[in-house]
Amino acid sequence: ELAEGQLWEAFMAASNFELDNLRVIIDRNGLQATGKTMDRFRIGDLEGKMEAFGFEVKVIDGHDVEEIADALDWADTVKKKPVCIIANTVKGKGVPFAEGIASFHNGTLTQEQYDEALRVLED
């Protein structure tokens, strides 16, 4: 999450210009293509960092559609500050062979994996 320097530069500019129409949604799943995010980038207190950049922050369950909708409604009430919604998620949630496994961050599923994922998610 947030390994690119230009993101942090944009965050600084967003609060400086009071971009209250900006919604940043961070998918915090803790994984990247090579493994756990924290093994490569020890970002620490993400909520505190975004607040320090001048954002109004809300942390939600990124798998809960109602929570997502409520957070977006809440964002519309924030004035003179950009908004950051940190969505805690599990990569591959609900698909046993992929859930929480970094190697499924990118790449292509086999036809068998694809069929199994659809079957599990449709149940």
Map each language-model feature to its residues.
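Glycine-rich ThDP/TPP pyrophosphate-binding loop and its adjacent helix/strand module
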Residues: E1-D123
